[in-house]
Amino acid sequence: MQAQGSLAAAESYAWHRPVLAQHAEQYDPRVRSRIERGAAMSAVDYIHLQHARQAWIARMEARVAGFDALLSPTVAIVPPLLSDVAPGEARDAAFFQANALVLRNTSVVNMLDGCALSLPCHVQGELPVGLMVWHAAGRDDAVLNVGQRIEELLQKQ
């Protein structure tokens, strides 16, 4: 889906373009560079990606229709320490790698136009992690019902 570029970058660039034109220096350089990637996407590529996205959504909805909800980690990794990814050229690669992993699971649900919630499920005193309960668009009630039941079970522990 992202081979020709990112829908998020194109859409964020469309929104931020007037502000960037006047105040680009006020943006975090890492964030600004990701937004500015959207300037390179053509209208043809954007429309192609939107059609591909709609086809992907339809396939996903058909596959998950019989499930109450789907479960996955909210993030793929425990977020790194700030000192490991703090601004600085030497840490940029680590930042972008961690950022991609932290956003990966929720971005998939967003790209699929799904709905989700995240339940904290970490052991007291350990770094926080979340369990994402998700489903296709319009299945909010199912997600909330499953999430409430899981929350009740987690509280018994």
Where are these regions (language model features)?
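Short, surface-exposed loop/helix-turn segments at secondary-structure junctions
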Residues: 4, 48, 80-103
